[in-house]
């Protein structure tokens, strides 16, 4: 009880909706919800319950991204933080499969309409067609060289 509990209670339905919207945009069709103590409940289409750890690394990455992007939205809604920059470090370098890369790229394209989105990756050559601009860093004689394409 108290002010913090009331704030959480007010924003929790919005958070759960946003998380599920982002998961859907990334073609991950589960029902995700957080309770007032931030315990998650994840249900499949057939309403079987799953724990976070039972998902593949790529599926966990989608869940993590949905939560991350939701927190950004909540901060904007609350007027406590509004930032037009999103920096994602090595998000494409780990566990997203080809479809996950495509789905995340679509979400980032939409976000880039109102935000400056920067993706740091070691797989630049595989992603050049996914972004409108790239900035490349290459180490030459112990100095970083920058080129833009």
Residue ranges of model-derived segments:
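Charged, surface-exposed helical/loop "interaction arms" that form contiguous linear patches used
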Residues: 1-31, 47, 82
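Catalytic phosphate/metal-binding cores of nucleic-acid and nucleotide-processing enzymes, i.e., regions
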Residues: 11, 37, 108
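Conserved catalytic network of the ASCE P-loop NTPase/AAA+ motor domain
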Residues: 25, 32-33, 55, 76-81, ...
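ABC-fold ATPase nucleotide-binding domain signature/coupling loops
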Residues: 29-60
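GG-anchored amphipathic helix commonly corresponding to the ABC/SMC/Rad50 NBD signature/C-loop
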Residues: 57-87
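Catalytic acidic motif of RecA-like/P-loop NTPases
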Residues: 73, 90-93, 125
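Conserved D-loop/post-Walker B switch-helix segment of ABC ATPase nucleotide-binding domains
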Residues: 78, 82-83, 91, 95-106
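C-terminal lobe/lid and adjacent interdomain/linker elements of RecA-like ASCE P-loop ATPase modules
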Residues: 99-149
């Amino acid at each position: 009880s108290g002010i913090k509990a009331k704030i959480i209670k007010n924003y929790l339905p919005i958070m759960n909706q946003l998380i599920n919207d982002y998961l859907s945009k990334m073609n991950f069709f589960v029902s995700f919800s957080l309770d007032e103590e931030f315990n998650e409940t994840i249900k499949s289409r057939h309403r079987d319950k799953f724990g976070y750890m039972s998902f593949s690394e790529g599926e966990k990455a989608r869940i993590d991204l949905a939560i991350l992007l939701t927190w950004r939205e909540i901060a904007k809604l609350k007027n406590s933080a509004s930032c037009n920059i999103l920096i994602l470090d090595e998000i494409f370098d780990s566990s997203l499969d080809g479809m996950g890369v495509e789905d995340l790229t679509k979400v980032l394209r939409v976000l880039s309409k109102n935000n400056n989105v920067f993706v740091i990756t070691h797989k630049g050559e595989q992603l050049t067609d996914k972004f409108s601009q790239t900035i490349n860093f290459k180490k030459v004689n112990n100095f970083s060289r920058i080129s833009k394409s």
